[in-house]
UniProtKB/Swiss-Prot annotation:
It is a single-pass membrane protein. It comes from the Eukaryota. Pfam families: PsbJ. This is Photosystem II reaction center protein J. The gene is psbJ. Its main location: plastid.
Length: 40
């Protein structure tokens, strides 16, 4: 394995944290279009 100075690659952090954020935003917009966004 290549030594990355003990740090997690930035692209991996962005992917792991980005997918749930995009999912939550998608659910939020879907809920608002369905009329459920007002309850959040």
């Amino acid at each position: 394995m290549a030594d990355t100075t003990g740090r997690i690659p930035l692209w991996l952090v962005g992917t792991v944290t980005g997918i749930p954020v995009i999912g939550l935003i998608g659910v939020f917009f879907y809920g608002s279009y369905s009329g459920l966004g007002s309850s959040l």
